[in-house]
Amino acid sequence: MAVPARHTSKAKKNKRRTHYKLTAPSVKFDETTGDYSRSHRVSLKGYYKGRKIAKANAAE
């Protein structure tokens, strides 16, 4: 049966877990709409790469 030969110390465990972290989403300023939006995604107003490709939400 597979059992660890030694107890994993808190330091060893925490050093391994230092790589588990959140990264901030990439955000860019869209000059067409004047809003900030995430890269490689359609903005809330329906623009992608400066071109209108989708209808905006009806709530606006």
UniProtKB/Swiss-Prot annotation:
<keyword id="KW-0689">Ribosomal protein</keyword>
<dbReference type="GO" id="GO:0006412">
    <property type="term" value="P:translation"/>
</dbReference>
<keyword id="KW-0687">Ribonucleoprotein</keyword>
<dbReference type="GO" id="GO:0003735">
    <property type="term" value="F:structural constituent of ribosome"/>
</dbReference>
<dbReference type="InterPro" id="IPR044957">
    <property type="entry name" value="Ribosomal_bL32_bact"/>
</dbReference>
<dbReference type="GO" id="GO:0015934">
    <property type="term" value="C:large ribosomal subunit"/>
</dbReference>
<dbReference type="InterPro" id="IPR011332">
    <property type="entry name" value="Ribosomal_zn-bd"/>
</dbReference>
<comment type="similarity">
    <text>Belongs to the bacterial ribosomal protein bL32 family.</text>
</comment>
<protein>
    <recommendedName>
        <fullName>Large ribosomal subunit protein bL32</fullName>
    </recommendedName>
</protein>
<dbReference type="Pfam" id="PF01783">
    <property type="entry name" value="Ribosomal_L32p"/>
</dbReference>
<dbReference type="InterPro" id="IPR002677">
    <property type="entry name" value="Ribosomal_bL32"/>
</dbReference>
